[in-house]
Amino acid sequence: TLNAYCALRKNAFDIPTVHMYDLYAPMTRDFEMKLTFDQAYDLLLEVVEPLGKDYQDVVRGAKDSRLIDVYETPNKSTGAYSAGSAYGVHPYVMLNFRPELDGLMTLAHEMGHAMHSYYSNHNQPFAKSDYTIFVAEVASTCNEVLTIHALRKKHEGNKAAQAALIGRMLEGFRTTVFRQAMFAEFEMIAHNMEEAGQPLTRESLCAAYYDLNKRYYGGGCRVDKLVENEWMRIPH
């Protein structure tokens, strides 16, 4: 459960209380992964081997064809994104690659989206090629899980690496399952407020979001008041 996960972090960090910001700290500082984009891509090609040679070849071709905007540049949008909605056009991927584990995980995630779009567009007519956001995240998180499993095999016997990688997987589960469910519930609350004729103000939305966080995390984590503003920075 979510409360058990908060308790695990409390024990791992040996702290009296887990705050919301403690959920984003790495489980250990004794493991650090540094790699270039080329190294990350070569590793990704190994990671997706279980998905078949055709999948590997298309992933390899995306890099060779310069379909990925890799590095941060002035005035470039933050984050990462896969643009695959143009039917008949190979998906493009935007990254702001960082030479560390998070950079590798983001690459794997976005290429999962790109490959989903590629196969959907190549196997479905235009009218049926689109997919829901919920289904889209299956393809991307699958690549994340494959990446963690591959890294754990590469670092077998390294306790610090195992702790870091398992912690990364657990945090991914929290943000992909629990956090996204909370976002969906917040959207439903906002729509219900509007349909009931209630004004959608910063104060009312912040109060609703704060109450949601207390319901989800209150049993194992101190929900600081500032978290009520988090909904404003979630783009999608």
Task: Please name every model-derived segment.
Residues 1-236:
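Cation-handling catalytic/transport regions enriched in His/Asp/Glu
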